[in-house]
């Protein structure tokens, strides 16, 4: 039975948007991610999934793997990607990510950067002005920015990436030519190792390889030099 308000039970997606979202433009939550590789640029689709109860109590469920933003990666390109550019996240989640990283610092260091959300906002502005996901690693860049803001030396090793909430870590969904998900998760390197046989098979299929060329393809599939940078579009 419905209440007097006929729309009471209807889902309103706007309720999921925080107060700051009104100030965002589409570039804050892009539909695609542009990744630089040694062979050129890859444009990868992004998928957004909202699973606020994922991983409650420390459980690593399938929902936890999907909570947040996930890059859609064709299996052929999996070994061309490097994890570092993806740590920057999309612009719309970067402030929350930087806040979480500041809160992950040991207490003796963290007390120099309070309130964390305000420091994170200033840090994000500096990161956007002076650094780029395409050329710079997030953690060392953030350490330098925090030192500039507060005059306190922060070693990159002081940040605890494992303490960052799962939804703030970029996810990856690896798909075959039929768009079937072959593997997914937050750890790109683990996926590359887990799917090395699938990578080899996809390369062989795409190139129509004979046995004489398999050795070269195996070396490519296992070597995966990795891309140098990327960013959300």
Language-model region placement:
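A positional "C-terminalness" feature that preferentially activates on distal terminal regions of long
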Residues: 1-233
